[in-house]
Regions:
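Conserved mid-core segment of classical short-chain dehydrogenase/reductases
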Residues: 86-104, 147-152, 192-195
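Catalytic Tyr-X3-Lys loop
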Residues: 96-116, 130, 134, 160
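Conserved glycine-rich cofactor-binding loop
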Residues: 14-15
């Protein structure tokens, strides 16, 4: 198994994407600490991977003291951290009509929570001389607003990718890798969204593969990126957009 004897933390583990990554880590042999804001959602994920759960904790990933206390509560090594915490975003409004607060909010959210979680764990990883920090971006970081009015979400994702590169440059000498995942829209993370058929068709036609990524695929890619097989990869953004964005 790719992650046997590894210890991972997943922030935002109660969400669809965080849960998918937690399950993938568990399937590859990791002990997984689940953290998020809603206990019931975390417990639902924990019930799927009972043998792999290290702990379940209610943690506000926007609060530095909450995250620092959580990291300190975990004994021994921390090999992997993944942040899947959602941001507050207003979309489907033209930029020229969007308020400053609505534009800036997702950028602040993304920068704050990823900075807090990654630096809290990086301090431990620097001491132990190794580890992997994973962040979640989106193809929105590379797309225009010609088809969809994304508000501040594009800039939020771009900030995550910038942080990935900056942190990778700083902590690499300690054996710590930093990688971002950039999927396109994943329909199975939002089954409650009623997307019109023509809208979904437009999304499909905009990809080289003619389909959209699935959350399980993102989870398995995260597991690979966190494994020793991906040892040379750092400061990189893994393109999981099915070709919606071509690097």
């Amino acid at each position: 198994m790719l992650l046997e004897n590894k210890v991972a933390i997943v922030y935002g583990a109660g969400g669809a994407m965080g849960g998918a990554v937690a399950r993938a880590f568990a399937a590859e042999g990791a002990t997984v600490h689940l953290a998020g804001r809603t206990l019931a959602k975390l417990e639902k994920v924990a019930a799927d991977i009972p043998a792999a759960v290290g702990s379940v904790a209610v943690v506000d990933a926007y609060d530095v003291e909450s995250v620092n206390a959580h990291v300190a509560s975990i004994e021994g090594r921390i090999d992997i951290v993944f942040n899947a915490v959602s941001v507050r975003v207003v979309q489907d409004v033209p930029l020229v009509e969007l308020s400053v607060d609505d534009f800036v909010r997702p950028v602040e959210d993304a920068a704050r929570t990823n900075f807090i979680t990654s630096t809290a764990v990086a301090r431990r990883m620097i001491v132990q001389r190794g580890g992997v920090i994973l962040m979640l971006s989106s193809s929105a970081a590379r797309e225009s607003g010609a088809d969809f009015e994304m508000g501040g979400f594009s800039l939020a994702c771009a900030s995550i990718e910038c942080l990935t590169r900056s942190m990778a440059g700083e902590v690499g000498k300690y054996g710590v890798r930093v990688v971002a995942l950039r999927p396109n829209f994943t329909p199975d993370t939002h089954p409650e969204w009623n997307i019109p058929a023509d809208g979904l068709d437009h999304l499909l036609k905009g990809t080289a593969l003619g389909r959209l990524p699935r959350k399980a695929e993102v989870g398995r890619t995260a597991a690979f990126a966190a494994s020793d097989h991906a040892g040379p990869i750092t400061g990189a953004v893994l393109n999981l957009s099915c070709g919606a964005v071509v690097d």
